[in-house]
Amino acid sequence: INFKKANILKLKKLNTSYDVIVSNPPYIELNEKKIMSKNVLGYEPHEAIFVTYDDPLVYYKKIILLAEQMKTNKSKVYFEINPKFCDDLKKHFLTTSFNDVEVQCDIFGKERMIKATNE
């Protein structure tokens, strides 16, 4: 197991191939802050929660780009996702070699996790 700590948006490439990439990037838009629970807002760093770019999928797209460059024969990418962007993220995956896409719901029935495999 290798862990990589980096500013993903500044990273140009990964130095090794990966079988599995797991990420929980920022995916909450700032306008959703008012509906967030206080226990999340009080204990999580805001830069870990809120995406402040025009494209809310910016982190996902960059990770997928890097994964494309460094994949193995059966690489998998796992993300926690914002349900409102699930369809857009699935469509983006289908434009890559990670075209076997599964979505899992959380305990409340919301689309929350996505797995993509390059099989």
Summary of predicted features, one role per range:
Residues 1-118:
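S-adenosylmethionine
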